[in-house]
A protein has these predicted regions:
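Conserved alpha/beta enzyme-core scaffold
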Residues: 1-133
Length: 133
């Protein structure tokens, strides 16, 4: 499989409704702006987005939130997006908050094909409630 594509539309063509996608970058730096724009244009819905943040209004994942394309957000920081807050408080958006280091460790484990990994972060806190420890 050739991993090099000519444009964002080609890069996202196999992302379907209900897919789980991981978006890179840190804050607003290094995010896949063109791929996000292509997903907005394509109208892909019910996405689970994994990212260290939820973007801001009118930029990044915030654009997909405005179009109600995100069903679930898995993130370590979500504090700068008013639309995110509105959808969360209205029950439209499912959210899984994860400490930054744990998020990075989970992504690494997934890359290695590991179905689970233990990290002591969060043990004995609300993060661990309802989870096997």
């Amino acid at each position: 499989m050739n991993k090099v594509v000519n444009n964002a539309e080609t890069a996202i063509q196999d992302i379907h409704d209900g897919a789980t996608i991981m978006l890179g970058g840190f804050g607003l730096c290094g995010i896949p702006e063109n791929c996000i724009a292509a997903l907005v244009k394509k109208g892909t819905k019910n996405l689970t987005c994994i990212s260290n943040n939820a973007g801001v209004d009118d930029f990044g994942i915030g654009l997909m939130l405005q179009q109600h394309q995100v069903k679930k957000m898995i993130s370590s920081y979500v504090g700068e997006n008013a639309e995110f807050e509105r959808q969360l408080l209205s029950g439209e958006l499912e959210v899984e908050l994860i400490p930054q280091g744990t998020l990075a460790t989970r992504c690494m484990a997934a890359g290695y094909g590991m179905p689970a990994i233990f990290t002591p972060a969060g043990v004995g806190t609300e993060v661990a409630d309802g989870k096997e420890t």
